[in-house]
Amino acid sequence: METPKPRILPWLVSQLDLGQLEGVAWLDESRTRFRIPWKHGLRQDAQMADFGIFQAWAEASGAYTPGKDKPDVSTWKRNFRSALNRKEVLRLAADNSKDPYDPHKVYEFVTPGARDFVHLGASPDTNGKSSLPHSQENLPKLFDGLILGPLKDEGSSDLAIVSDPSQQLPSPNVNNFLNPAPQENPLKQLLAEEQWEFEVTAFYRGRQVFQQTLFCPGGLRLVGSTADMTLPWQPVTLPDPEGFLTDKLVKEYVGQVLKGLGNGLALWQAGQCLWAQRLGHSHAFWALGEELLPDSGRGPDGEVHKDKDGAVFDLRPFVADLIAFMEGSGHSPRYTLWFCMGEMWPQDQPWVKRLVMVKVVPTCLKELLEMAREGGASSLKTVDLHISNSQPISLTSDQYKAYLQDLVEDMDFQATGNI
């Protein structure tokens, strides 16, 4: 008979009580707060002992068999975190994973007595919460099959409750009915340089005159008709105003802005940022706004400088805000870039009064937000990830959040210089 997969919380409490895994320990006498080592797998000083808790859970859950399967620390850690994500009786109390000397996370049980509750082997209900497996009438029969024994620490008054293995039954797990999560983080493929696609929309005095969606692995350039087409970055030519505007003076001014673009405004992705650089004479200001309007009631986020690159979007805070959004923050992260060409940013005027406004939407970021909205706050919902030239991947909301958390950790690790 196949051994049933253990539930994460009773298993974790037992590991904490045993105290045999390096760095895994209770932090208070009431045993409600505990620490888990959280070192990045690519650190130069990383050793297998640093990932003992993740490997132990991988073995206990049947995801890894020593000598048979290839060790995969990142997958072990992601599966462990995904299992904890859907436990409402737990919360992350402190994230010290960036500590250069002792990277770890602190968790705590948020409900008084929850630690003892999960130790009794409570099973999850359909909402991811905990419920007792037996009614009060059946409690005497339940305790007949239990052996009460002291904890390893003889000075403690707590008692460990160990069930007779023959009495254990496998608990239903919604993840058993879903597609298994891919070993590699699929979000890295979605955000790979060759996957960056941009939806570009241009407005002349508030009127939409151009929209195009295009793959730009090396970046793009917003240009007029006089640009050098042999330069790097894919040229996106803004249309002549003649066929769109009736006011002769406005057409003339728009034409001057387009001519002043020269070799264009370049936008490209490198590392975890989007970068912009102005190659012509026309000044340009940028801001992160909503997809339907540029939030012109405030000042710009910055100016695009001539012949000097500058970051206009950072993926790290976007992903962090996306995780917070999934956890119920209510704040939807922004990803739409607006550029005002040839004039000051419309801080005190309606944006539709500006001669040339260009909106750029990275479609991969839009898709990430849509996936978060589809999953919502429910760990039981699934989201489909669509990547070019591949089959859609179905993920639970918890798996999706775990992959996002992986991205944040990787970006933090790269930002600290690979300690």
Swiss-Prot record:
Modified residue annotations for Phosphoserine: 14, 97, 123, 135, 378-379, 388, 390
Subunit and interaction comment: Monomer. Homodimer; phosphorylation-induced. Interacts (when phosphorylated) with CREBBP. Interacts with MAVS (via phosphorylated pLxIS motif). Interacts with TICAM1 (via phosphorylated pLxIS motif). Interacts with STING1 (via phosphorylated pLxIS motif). Interacts with IKBKE and TBK1. Interacts with TICAM2. Interacts with RBCK1. Interacts with HERC5. Interacts with DDX3X; the interaction allows the phosphorylation and activation of IRF3 by IKBKE. Interacts with TRIM21 and ULK1, in the presence of TRIM21; this interaction leads to IRF3 degradation by autophagy.
Modified how: Constitutively phosphorylated on many Ser/Thr residues. Activated following phosphorylation by TBK1 and IKBKE. Innate adapter proteins, such as MAVS, STING1 or TICAM1, are first activated by viral RNA, cytosolic DNA, and bacterial lipopolysaccharide (LPS), respectively, leading to activation of the kinases TBK1 and IKBKE. These kinases then phosphorylate the adapter proteins on the pLxIS motif, leading to recruitment of IRF3, thereby licensing IRF3 for phosphorylation by TBK1.
Primary residence: cytoplasm
Family: Belongs to the IRF family.
Cross-link (Glycyl lysine isopeptide (Lys-Gly) (interchain with G-Cter in ISG15)): 188, 353, 359
Segments for region (Mediates interaction with ZDHHC11): 140-419
Effect of residue 359 to A/R: Abolished acetylation by KAT8, leading to increased transcription factor activity
An example Gene Ontology molecular-function term: DNA-binding transcription factor activity, RNA polymerase II-specific
Modification N6-acetyllysine occurs at: 359
Modified residues (Diphosphoserine): 379
Annotation: DNA-binding region: 5-111
Record site: Cleavage: 121-122, 125-126
Function: Key transcriptional regulator of type I interferon (IFN)-dependent immune responses which plays a critical role in the innate immune response against DNA and RNA viruses. Regulates the transcription of type I IFN genes (IFN-alpha and IFN-beta) and IFN-stimulated genes (ISG) by binding to an interferon-stimulated response element (ISRE) in their promoters. Acts as a more potent activator of the IFN-beta (IFNB) gene than the IFN-alpha (IFNA) gene and plays a critical role in both the early and late phases of the IFNA/B gene induction.
Disruption phenotype: Double knockout with TREX1 does not show a visible phenotype.
Positions bearing Phosphothreonine: 3, 75, 230, 237, 246, 396
Entry annotated with the keyword tRNA processing: no
Name of the featured protein: Interferon regulatory factor 3
Gene Ontology biological process: cellular response to lipopolysaccharide; cellular response to virus; cytoplasmic pattern recognition receptor signaling pathway; defense response to virus; lipopolysaccharide-mediated signaling pathway; positive regulation of DNA-templated transcription; positive regulation of interferon-alpha production; positive regulation of interferon-beta production
PANTHER family: INTERFERON REGULATORY FACTOR, INTERFERON REGULATORY FACTOR 3
Description of how activity is regulated: In the absence of viral infection, maintained as a monomer in an autoinhibited state. Phosphorylation by TBK1 and IKBKE disrupts this autoinhibition leading to the liberation of the DNA-binding and dimerization activities and its nuclear localization where it can activate type I IFN and ISG genes. Phosphorylation and activation follow the following steps: innate adapter proteins, such as MAVS, STING1 or TICAM1, are first activated by viral RNA, cytosolic DNA and bacterial lipopolysaccharide (LPS), respectively, leading to activation of the kinases TBK1 and IKBKE.
Record has Cell cycle as a keyword: no
UniProt KW keywords: Acetylation, Activator, Antiviral defense, Cytoplasm, DNA-binding, Immunity, Innate immunity, Isopeptide bond, Mitochondrion, Nucleus, Phosphoprotein, Transcription, Transcription regulation, Ubl conjugation
Gene Ontology, cellular component aspect: chromatin; cytoplasm; cytosol; mitochondrion; nucleus
Region (Interaction with HERC5): 194-353
Subcellular location: Cytoplasm; Nucleus; Mitochondrion
